[in-house]
């Protein structure tokens, strides 16, 4: 497709302004929650991040598509997707100021527009994204829609915060990814709420064998087979999972035989862990989605630049202070960015320490997690230890 062949399109904000532009994606009309990211690079990573499920993503970077899209099927030496965060695009649509009709990059195999058309994703350019973001910052995240000329109108727009989105992106059955061969390999049970490939990569490169379980799996019943439990990122409102994931995590926290099991949560996993501990979460006005957000480590006083993608936050004032205390705080809006247990090896972060795309300032948190598993195995794990049976399990998410 060329700029001369592009169809007209319209981007409408519910109860707000509408904008005329051009379509460079799939000829479909769709709706969803409108959110924005200020990230300068990494649009393939963002679009395939399960945390964006059901959302219309507005890019503030003025020019999008200039380095094309790499081959999404390429895998690394660990069998993980090398250039994408999952095997499919999860955004409902993308909105950009200017689309780069010509692209150039040594890894690119297709244009962003061609990729969107193949994936059935609406994409609209020629939009004043600066004005859109100013509106969202003042009015808060809202529902919206992208209508493409000649495309059938989409069904009634459904607010993704009202839907169990995690069930749509989580694996349906367990799968197993062996860690990098090391002198010692630790075993982790990962609760899949929509885990990104680079989170898995950050574990396996450190010699961690990862068994991934569905979001509603009773992790408490199998935690004794592992050296640690990990709770992943994911989309939507965490309160939806109070009777499934949160209830399972609460049993895990309360089990007297599992008091020293290391637990690490990221993003949605952070929120679910906080809910299981008895805290509350709140919906943010417009959320934090960027690669350059400063977070203060309250234990050291050091500031880190972090990658973030969330529309909900933990209310730190509701934490049970005899058990959990804040670990990180956002220096822009003072929202909570992490919690840690006062005596047990349990902590979580709202931001993404795996940083893809984005900075790797906080990748040391994965090293700390491995060290906690080393201590747990040496000091607390009961013998004989029976590992969870992984023979015959698939090595990729089952959808």
UniProtKB/Swiss-Prot annotation:
Its EC number is 6.3.5.5. PROSITE patterns: GATASE_TYPE_1. One of its GO terms (cellular component) is cytoplasm. Its main location: cytoplasm. Keywords: Amino-acid biosynthesis, Arginine biosynthesis, ATP-binding, Cytoplasm, Glutamine amidotransferase, Ligase, Nucleotide-binding. It holds the Pfam family CPSase_sm_chain. Pathway: Amino-acid biosynthesis; L-arginine biosynthesis; carbamoyl phosphate from bicarbonate: step 1/1. It catalyses: hydrogencarbonate + L-glutamine + 2 ATP + H2O = carbamoyl phosphate + L-glutamate + 2 ADP + phosphate + 2 H(+). The keyword rRNA processing does not apply. It is found in: Cytoplasm. The keyword Nucleotide-binding applies. GO terms for biological process: 'de novo' pyrimidine nucleobase biosynthetic process; glutamine metabolic process; L-arginine biosynthetic process; pyrimidine nucleotide biosynthetic process. Small subunit of the arginine-specific carbamoyl phosphate synthase (CPSase). CPSase catalyzes the formation of carbamoyl phosphate from the ammonia moiety of glutamine, carbonate, and phosphate donated by ATP, constituting the first step of 2 biosynthetic pathways, one leading to arginine and/or urea and the other to pyrimidine nucleotides. The small subunit (glutamine amidotransferase) binds and cleaves glutamine to supply the large subunit with the substrate ammonia. Heterodimer composed of 2 chains; the small (or glutamine) chain promotes the hydrolysis of glutamine to ammonia, which is used by the large (or ammonia) chain to synthesize carbamoyl phosphate. HAMAP family: CPSase_S_chain (MF_01209). Belongs to the CarA family. This is Carbamoyl phosphate synthase arginine-specific small chain. It comes from Eremothecium gossypii (strain ATCC 10895 / CBS 109.51 / FGSC 9923 / NRRL Y-1056).
């Amino acid at each position: 497709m060329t700029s001369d062949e592009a169809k007209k399109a319209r981007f409408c904000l519910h109860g707000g302004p509408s904008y005329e532009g051009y379509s460079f994606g799939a000829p479909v009309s769709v709706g969803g929650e409108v959110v924005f990211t200020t990230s300068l690079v990494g649009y393939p990573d963002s679009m395939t991040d399960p945390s964006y499920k059901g959302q219309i993503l507005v890019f503030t970077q003025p020019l999008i598509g200039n380095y094309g899209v790499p081959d999404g099927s390429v895998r690394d030496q660990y069998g993980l997707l090398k250039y994408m965060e999952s095997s499919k695009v999860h955004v409902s649509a993308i909105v950009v100021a200017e689309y780069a009709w010509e692209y150039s990059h040594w890894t690119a195999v297709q244009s962003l527009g061609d990729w969107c058309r193949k994936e059935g994703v609406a994409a609209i350019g020629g939009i004043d994204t600066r004005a859109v973001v100013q509106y969202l910052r003042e009015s808060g995240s809202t529902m919206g829609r992208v209508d493409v000329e000649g495309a059938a109108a989409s069904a009634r727009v459904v607010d993704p915060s009202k839907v169990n989105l995690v069930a749509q992106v989580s694996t349906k059955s367990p799968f197993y990814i062996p860690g990098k061969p090391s002198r010692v390999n630790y075993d982790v049970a990962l609760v899949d709420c929509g885990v990104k490939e680079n989170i898995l990569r950050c574990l396996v490169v450190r010699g961690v064998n990862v068994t991934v379980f569905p979001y509603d799996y009773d992790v408490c019943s199998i935690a004794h087979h592992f050296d640690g439990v990990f709770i992943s990122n994911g989309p939507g409102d965490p309160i939806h999972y109070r009777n499934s994931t949160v209830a399972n995590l609460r049993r895990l926290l309360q089990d007297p035989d599992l008091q020293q099991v290391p637990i690490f949560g990221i993003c949605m996993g952070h929120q679910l862990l906080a809910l299981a501990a008895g805290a509350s979460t709140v919906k943010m006005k417009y959320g934090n989605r960027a690669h350059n957000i400063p977070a203060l480590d309250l234990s050291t006083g050091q500031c880190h630049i972090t990658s973030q993608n969330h529309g909900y936050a933990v209310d730190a004032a509701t934490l049970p202070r005899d058990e959990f205390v804040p670990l990180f705080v956002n220096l822009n809006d003072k929202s909570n960015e992490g919690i840690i247990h006062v005596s047990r090896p349990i902590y979580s972060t709202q931001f993404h320490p795996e940083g893809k795309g984005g900075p790797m300032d906080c990748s040391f948190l994965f090293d700390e997690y491995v060290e906690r598993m080393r201590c747990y195995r040496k000091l607390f794990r009961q013998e004989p230890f029976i590992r969870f049976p992984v023979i015959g399990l698939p090595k990729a998410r089952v959808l």
